[in-house]
Structures are given as C-alpha cells and as structure tokens.
Amino acid sequence: MIFDDRGQRGVYGDVVLINGVPYLYLEVERRKYRFRVLNGSASRTYELAVSQDEKTLTIGDGLTVIATDAGLLATPVELKTPAAGLQIGIAERYEIVIDFAAYPDHVEHLYLRNLGFPSNLDSEPQALLRFDLKRRVPDDSIIPTQLGKVTPIGNLIPSNAKRRTFRFERTGGEWKINNKTWDPQRIDANPGLGDYEIWTFVNTGGWVHPVHVHL
C-alpha cells in the first residue's frame, strides 16, 4: 500500500456525529422547533434539507432560516425541496425553524438529510438525524415577517485604501498563497496603525476552505 502524503484533502469520517452521538434520533411534538446548527466538522461542508424519506428526497418539505453567525436576519428565508437546501460551511452557524405541525398524523418520521456537496470527497447524500413525530399540541407561535433590524453600513473605506488580493491554490500537493509557500520569516502584509486596506480572498484550490486571518 502506498500513501500519498502530498494528496491530503482533509479528514472525512464515515459516520456523522450530532452532539457527539451517531445515528441520532429526536422525539418531537407536532409544533414549531427552533434549532441552532453548528458545522463542527473538520473538512465537510453540508447542504441540509428536510425529507419524509430516509433514502430519497421528498418534494415540498422545508425549513426556515432565521439567523446566522451575525445574528437575526432582517426577514426569514424559507428553503423548500428540491429547489434549495441550507449550505453550511466549516465552523458556520445558523438558526432554523422546522414546523412539525405542518405534517399530517400518518407522517411519523422526518429526516434531516445532507444532500451532498460537490467539493466533498464523499458527496453522496445521507440522512443525518431522524425526527420521530409524536403528539399534536397547541402552538400559537409565529415566525415574524420582520426579525432583526439591519442598519445599512455606509462607505467606511476611503478611496485611497490599499487593495490586496490573496489567491489560494494547490499545485503538486502543496498549498500556496500568491504562488508562495508558507515561510515563517516572510511577512506578506504589514499594514500600519490606522491604515485602511481591502483584502480579497480568491479560492482556486478545488474545494471549500474556511480561510481566516490570524493577527
């Protein structure tokens, strides 16, 4: 067996854990639930959708996105199959609402499914979480049409701000930024105190990567 140590594409386990539990199921009442979702995977990006079937995607099932890492959205966003799922990258967070009261009594199970993501090595769809629908209860809660107040931000950057572009590429198994490998002795950007700069990150590496800056 030959292992190519220059061909790494992250670590993909064959079982997805939710809150540390494999093959998780959750008993729910037939009402609205608000969930906070964090992608804690080291390498995997998800596209989440609700389905009435464990193996195939059913049509017309939905979830409503109400918040992101930055807090409440201005308005809720409803995602229904098969048109759209919730794409969630590594370390991203979302808050969603699923209305289990919308399903008739003969529907006993729902599944939170990963539709697969092209950049993942194993992009096959799979069920992540099973909801067991139980008793129907009164629920007068509503999802407001207006959520958080989002104040538009004006132009804070002066016209003479310095612009930098950082291109992330992978050639021959080696990661490069602007065609340079990492060197702890080299400084690629050294803004002065009070300077304004606009940085553009371009990912051409072939898959999603959570690029972030260390100061």
Each PLM stretch: what is its role?
Residues 152-158, 162-215:
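C-terminal substrate/ligand-recognition segments
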Residues 1-154:
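Histidine- and aromatic-rich segments of cupredoxin/plastocyanin-like copper-binding domains
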